[in-house]
Curated annotation (Swiss-Prot):
This is 3-oxoacyl-[acyl-carrier-protein] reductase FabG. It comes from Chlamydia pneumoniae. Pathway: Lipid metabolism; fatty acid biosynthesis. The gene is fabG. Its EC number is 1.1.1.100. One of its GO terms (biological process) is fatty acid biosynthetic process.
Amino acid sequence: MDITLVGKKVIVTGGSRGIGLGIVKLFLENGADVEIWGLNEERGQAVIESLTGLGGEVSFARVDVSHNGGVKDCVQKFLDKHNKIDILVNNAGITRDNLLMRMSEDDWQSVISTNLTSLYYTCSSVIRHMIKARSGSIINVASIVAKIGSAGQTNYAAAKAGIIAFTKSLAKEVAARNIRVNCLAPGFIETDMTSVLNDNLKAEWLKSIPLGRAGTPEDVARVALFLASQLSSYMTAQTLVVDGGLTY
């Protein structure tokens, strides 16, 4: 038994940058064929050009995961092409930070729709095919914010906490069909999402991390690879924290 993903067909939502891109790269290097879902087609095509030749086949589909119709259509197109889906990584996410008293309803709804409701759309679209195959791995990307909270992020924290609960519940529904559903909870990871934070806030975060550094997308991707592979074949309904010891 090893960590290879040769022959596996994979969808990674939000896979054109940050943690998602790190996961896509590592999966390709380990032999998987990966379709990236995102909104920015120009960025997606540039990413494909940079990743071609890494190992598996890579493609891009423009998908708004907050709309069920588009998700269903793209899952069907993926199945028409590959005839199966082995691994789904739900990584797409946005932030619309503000104190609750100043947060607009649109800021609340857009984060919940993209970060949480999208899992209902993607998972409900692929799960029947995984059930038929009696095989599959779903990896949902949450955040340590779900566990510790974050001022100014009630919408984001609520969505990420919902992902953890969703993961546990879906895992119990489909375990008998040999489908595993697990979750990642990254901490402070150097991505374009965290690059906008001011230096003082970054410094405070780093002081709280026992390992003394921010994480990288590759740090998270290696754990995702473990969950996608047969090395974790007896794991489901779990949330693996990747935060350098911040929430020990």
